[in-house]
């Protein structure tokens, strides 16, 4: 299922630029960013990001500015209305999620609770 959920999870321009850059470095234009939720972290759930070329039957693909995100339906329900950004600062660089569904978020921003 592609783009039916585009308005439910979006990328910032910084995230799009970084994803495109990483795909260029890998020289594999079939790569898509997969986000999924795992149990763990200090707040109960953790965001996980990987580049992937395989798409499962129930995966949802969201494409924005020629960048594709793969997400499974269960993870999407936790991220509904969210935004993926890319942050660079003195502490390092990482993809982060602005999640309107999170009741609590840990200080590093990589885990949350609902």
Swiss-Prot record:
This protein's UniProt keywords: Iron, Iron-sulfur, Metal-binding
Gene Ontology molecular function terms on file: 2 iron, 2 sulfur cluster binding; 4 iron, 4 sulfur cluster binding; iron ion binding
Listed name of the protein: Iron-sulfur cluster insertion protein ErpA
Organism: Buchnera aphidicola subsp. Acyrthosiphon pisum (strain APS)
InterPro entries reported in the protein's UniProt record: FeS_biogenesis (IPR000361), FeS_cluster_insertion (IPR016092), FeS_cluster_insertion_CS (IPR017870), FeS_cluster_insertion_RrpA (IPR023063), HesB-like_dom_sf (IPR035903)
PANTHER family: IRON-SULFUR CLUSTER ASSEMBLY 2 HOMOLOG, MITOCHONDRIAL (PTHR43011:SF1)
Quaternary structure (record): Homodimer.
Pfam families membership: Fe-S_biosyn
